[in-house]
Amino acid sequence: MKEPMTKLENPVLMATIGGAQGLRGEVRAKAYTADPTALGDYGHLHSMDGRSFEILEIREMKNVVVVRFRGINDRNAAEALNGLELYIERDNLPDEELEDDEFYYADLEGLEARDDQGVSYGTVTGVFDFGAGDLLELKGPGKRPVLIPFSEASVLEIDLEAGTLLIDPLAAGLVDDPEELSKFTPDKPKKKK
């Protein structure tokens, strides 16, 4: 853990540390990788306060992984990490393993959500999974964030190069009535009379 402080440019959340496991400094962690034990394949993990963590050992246990980090040698040191989120730089994720229609959730943040008429419904500010399917958080200028389902019905197309998502506002729950679509223009200011 005595690595130099690291400031990440484009951090991607990889794991959240839970409680201590045993007396040797091991911790339980929730890994956000397809294969939880692959967490060790990404090199050093970093906290947002700049600390760097090297995984020495990792094993699966029920719904978590048990991890031993260099420099964390006793239960007290392990307990001090409870709740800490660990990140890697986005550039460290392997793009060559992705199919043409695959992407990382981190790549969705910042995309503008538009309908087929070009009306903007906001920018993606987060991707969440609360257990009933993935949700995208959209936030427009001066508006409260809204969550829409991240499904084929709601999100029709993702264009990372153009920085846009094509959405169906009706399927996404942003409008209740198809007739409202012609009236709804959230990205255009109202005209003064």
UniProtKB/Swiss-Prot annotation:
GO terms for molecular function: ribosome binding. Binds ribosomal protein uS19. The PRC barrel domain binds ribosomal protein uS19. An accessory protein needed during the final step in the assembly of 30S ribosomal subunit, possibly for assembly of the head region. Essential for efficient processing of 16S rRNA. May be needed both before and after RbfA during the maturation of 16S rRNA. It has affinity for free ribosomal 30S subunits but not for 70S ribosomes. The keyword Cytoplasm applies. GO terms for biological process: ribosomal small subunit biogenesis; rRNA processing. It is found in: Cytoplasm. Disulfide bonds: none annotated. Residues 100-173 form the PRC barrel domain. One of its GO terms (cellular component) is cytoplasm. This is Ribosome maturation factor RimM. Belongs to the RimM family. Gene3D superfamilies: PRC-barrel domain (2.30.30.240), RimM (2.40.30.60). PANTHER family: RIBOSOME MATURATION FACTOR RIMM. The keyword Cytoplasm applies. Keywords: Chaperone, Cytoplasm, Ribosome biogenesis, rRNA processing.
